[in-house]
Amino acid sequence: MKAYVAVDIGASSGRLMLGQLEDGKLKLQEMHRFKNGFEFKNNHDRWNIDYLIDEIFKGLEKIKESGYTEVSLGIDTWAVDYVLVGKDGKKLQDPISYRDKRTSNSINELTTEVSKEYIYKKTGIQFLNFNTLYQLFEEDKELLKKTDKIMMIPDYIGYILTGKAVTEITNASTTQMLSLREGLFDKNLLEKVNVSSDQFAKLVDAGTVLGNLKEDWYSKYELPKVNVVTVATHDTASAVIGTPCEGQHWAYLSSGTWSLIGTELNIPENGAKVFKENYTNEWGAYGTYRFLKNIMGLWMAQCVKKELNDQYSFSELAELAGEVEPFEQFINVNDQRFQNPGNMIQEIQTYCRETGQKVPETPGEIMMAIYSNLALFYANEISKLDDIMGYHIDTLNIVGGGSNVALMNQLTSTIANVDVYAGPSEATAIGNILVQMITAGDVLNVYLGRRIISNSFDIKHYTPEQGKYSKVLAEYQQFLNKERG
């Protein structure tokens, strides 16, 4: 029985998941888990990329110890961040995190040189101040001159493992430098940030085989034979592949540190209406586009948990929230002030004071403020999707860690008036593995793969509670409009 390993690294944790097809069902087991996070070093918030690679090898050693002698392996991580690699093939610095404050005003600065309309028409990508385009705009110019290759995080990890450099297209699209239809980097945008297309390795599709690990690794670690496949390396792209896609007019919500809500298209949408709403057209696997909005996710809850000294689990925090009435205050969860505050609890409380609302004090009140306002924001985005697509989204497929938060899922279903199918929580790893299986010929296509997912995992169904909170979405929309002036 073939074994497939997903290296799935998010902003707060990473894992190695092993998947196998057994009697038409995908069996998934976690082989290794580790923490992730940035640290302030050399004047910036940076990722410890060497630590992440070391943890991958620890996981592979565990897999070998478990009796697996040969595996396929794919790597996905968060998007937009990159590693600068010199001519000697070594990194020039530890990669800077997208949450670093260096790009806080970069959109305004860069768009004095090139218009927003040009950028959006060319790339179709949502304006976010941490996109790779703006990070490179703020990058050390002398360091860029020494750079031979600019590698996205998962591409760099694949390069270290195999010695082969590529630029996988689903992640490349998140840079806001990739041409929407040609699938090539836009030279005008590259020039504005002092880089050239030669500084990126060859663009490849998901499902490209990189091959075996470098021999040096086998002398250093006790490893199985590993065949590396370039999957949909942006974790959201993998998560969408791993979404069951229940319903006729469906949308997805990849609910983790970030919330990514949208639908899957065969033809991108980058007209005036979607430009105004700041939607993105990220490339998906197999010729699709992920039409979505990138908004705040469980990052707020993760920060609160940490600030409470981890004395509560997420399930315990959800229980405490369930004892509190929802919608006691309205919060624009996408406000930039919540992106990387010194203290999330204090930031939420200050926001409520400044807007003249009830201030949440207890852990339960704070968590309910987060969950209920995330649900409101999701419902608001679904109403925008309805308008853009010209039909009512009737089903929302929630995957990722947030699919386990029943309270938030039920509120979302009721407020948005949609059926919610929650799960699987490990959709990213599943989508990663599914691309490997398609590449190997074990699964014919994504459609059949999604049917396997539906039959393999527990998917919870939530339906709207009729008559509850019927006016709250309109009130929240009025609040957002007033706040934005």
Swiss-Prot record:
The active site is at residue 235. It catalyses: L-rhamnulose + ATP = L-rhamnulose 1-phosphate + ADP + H(+). Keywords: ATP-binding, Kinase, Magnesium, Nucleotide-binding, Plasmid, Rhamnose metabolism, Transferase. ATP binds at residues 11-15, 257, 302, 401. GO terms for biological process: rhamnose catabolic process. The keyword Calcium does not apply. GO terms for molecular function: ATP binding; rhamnulokinase activity. Its EC number is 2.7.1.5. InterPro entries: ATPase_NBD, FGGY_C, FGGY_Carb_Kinase, FGGY_N, Rhamnulokinase. HAMAP family: Rhamnulokinase. This is Rhamnulokinase. It comes from Ligilactobacillus salivarius (strain UCC118).
